[in-house]
Amino acid sequence: MTLSLETHDDTDKTQRGVAAVDRALQIIAALEASTIPRNLSEISRATSLYKSTILRILQSLLDAGYVVRVEESKYALGPTIMQLGLAYERANPLRHLFLPIMQKLVDSGSESPSFHIQQTSEERLCLFRLNSNHSTLDRVHAGDRLPVRRGAAGKVLLAFGEEPQQGAEMDEIRKNCFAISLGERDKFCAGIAAPVFTRRNRLLGALSFSGPKERFEPADVERMKKDILAAAGELTTELGGVYPV
């Protein structure tokens, strides 16, 4: 059964790119998803690759510094990954646009702002995150992958994405450029979100506020809605778009 799955996967990936590179990226993703070093069996379960295949690729990743060996039999991400992350931060033009506006929201007393983009059909990626000046239960960090089908930011991405989801809630989000989530991703947390667009009003991602659910009473939400729509509108204008509401 394993052979059949792996062979099918190789054929599909070869048509789209280089199978060895795809496998190396699978291994890196498996290590990135874990908070502790992983052994060969754990990497194999996470990637559905043979251990012999993983060992060959790991040697190349070790030589290039993308992976380090820990305790002789476990592996973790290496220093090259950190260097790439730092280079990305330096070169990312969106960082210089988003973070000052998000900091202004924090300084005004908002809940914790984040900016999310769709990563896969089931995941979103937190690209930027600042913590509010209040206590918060919502432990989200830049770089975190979160379910796209739960949470306010996920709803916005589904409503305005390349394949817009249908339904009454999605229609309401598209009409108002606003989504709310109460205890969906975490029963103690809540959030609101608004879309950010680029030229020709293409969706870039979702700007959100999140925090403890008790601070998202109707009056709080109405107040925060004005702030998040204003910020999303400002970002859209800076990116060459025209905000729909």
Which residues are covered by each model-predicted region?
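Short hydrophobic/aromatic beta-strand element in the GNAT-like acyltransferase core
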Residues: 114, 181, 193
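Juxtadomain coupling helices with adjacent low-complexity linkers
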Residues: 164-171, 175-182, 187-188, 206-245
